[in-house]
């Protein structure tokens, strides 16, 4: 974040791996502290908290600590924290969840959590449609920032 001192928008997504070993209350408390630190360093930036993404049904079955119901509980707590602290909340999970609330299997053929280039485009398109001045964000901006998915700020 310090690489972009004039950031106008900062997008944060944490949690996919941590929910397996960090309790919800501790997770949300530490997430809030992290966001507050960002706000102190970038008081004029809009800060967007992104929901934790769902996992595939096969990941959920093989690793129950990553249950999508648990992810939904963490996301509800993140939404409440974001509202209390006046941060924007983006329910990115809605762009990835299938009719059962799972990440489609083809989205993450390797580990059931992390997806490939096609789904980074889905993420990028979601962000463009759900932030202010989304027409000012382009794929060229993402490439310029060194990201294959979307601009970090």
Roles of regions detected by a PLM:
Residues 24-34, 68-74:
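Charged helix-capping and loop-helix junction motifs
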Residues 1-3, 32-41:
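Short amphipathic alpha-helices and their capping/turn segments at secondary-structure boundaries
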Residues 54-150:
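Catalytic His-Asp segment of secreted/periplasmic serine-dependent ester chemistry enzymes
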